[in-house]
Swiss-Prot record:
This is Spermidine/putrescine import ATP-binding protein PotA. The lineage of its organism: Bacteria, Thermotogati, Thermotogota, Thermotogae, Thermotogales. Its EC number is 7.6.2.11. It catalyses: ATP + H2O + polyamine-[polyamine-binding protein]Side 1 = ADP + phosphate + polyamineSide 2 + [polyamine-binding protein]Side 1. PROSITE patterns: ABC_TRANSPORTER_1 (PS00211), ABC_TRANSPORTER_2 (PS50893), POTA (PS51305). It comes from Thermotoga maritima (strain ATCC 43589 / DSM 3109 / JCM 10099 / NBRC 100826 / MSB8). Keywords: ATP-binding, Cell inner membrane, Cell membrane, Membrane, Nucleotide-binding, Translocase, Transport. PANTHER family: SPERMIDINE/PUTRESCINE IMPORT ATP-BINDING PROTEIN POTA, SPERMIDINE_PUTRESCINE IMPORT ATP-BINDING PROTEIN POTA. ATP binds at residues 38-45. GO terms for cellular component: ATP-binding cassette (ABC) transporter complex. It is found in: Cell inner membrane.
Amino acid sequence: MIGGEVSIKNVSKFFDDFQVLKNVSLDIKKGEFFSILGPSGCGKTTLLRVIAGFEGVESGDVLLDGKSILNLPPNKRPVNIIFQNYALFPHLTVFENIAFPLKLKKLSENEINQRVNELLSLIRMEEHAQKMPSQLSGGQKQRVAIARALANEPRVLLLDEPLSALDAKLRQELLVELDNLHDRVGITFIYVTHDQAEAISVSDRVALMNEGEIVQVGTPYEVYESPVNVFAATFIGETNLMKAEVVEVEDEYYVVESPGIGQFRCYRDKEAKKGDRLLITLRPEKIRISRKQFRSEETFNVFHGVVDEEIYMGHQTKYFVRLDEGYIMKVYKQHARYILDEPIIKWEDEVFITWNPDDSFIVEVLEE
């Protein structure tokens, strides 16, 4: 199978007086696993339905390999979509469900049998060919829905939160399977989800949406490590947001004064001048925590505080540290063998925290 290149050009869509898509533009590469991530109601499913042909638009265009498909009906587009409920035919077997689109194309029985058997092998469900959908688990139904969607050899596969109805463990297992399947078939996957972990774990690139607009597009690393604004910083993962004022401008850093924290250095990634007010983000896992004082010659940004709350998560412990000047800093400490000999940090312990100035950076220069 060969993936298609999808271009969405300045697409706007209204439902009555409500604008659900606001001049949306995206370029999705051939064979890419591309995720559209955002909260409920942000327009991501509507955008998927526009690509599939189930929704019209007020303005803009949708192109596949450089040619507009906007005026093509859904059945004429080389695109298939998988919905949240999989939409399997309950009265047909697994084999018959996968064969259904091939029968509509009036292929010969030999061609249908060959293609369906190839797809059953691809999803590793040869032994379930004669089962009814009611006899399948949620994960098996999802695989059958994917196989049926691939039967017509689409250029693009659209997936509308296909794992949302599954439990967390199965969801993670099937996400890995989906990623492996994408690698094997080579077509373009466009995956819609509100789950940040899903999007950043399997995608080549991610588009972050909010209120009908594209906020940021980039690799999972880029959107997590370099969020472009407050929404991007807070929607993907957790963070500490700190208001601060620039008190000194250095070559690489700003020295800032933050209420409830004090003075610290942050990375100079946006232009600001002395006296400007900033909003700064710092991921909790970037912060080191210890009951011992850090050597000042080795680190910047050292603060003292008391553990207000601790939450043991298995792979890490989440600490909420009340600093001497009042700010409560979220600090996530990963568990590893090499730190087992360190004193265990508990509730009400006095602690020191520190972070590299490169890990705290500006998400917004606030207006006066």
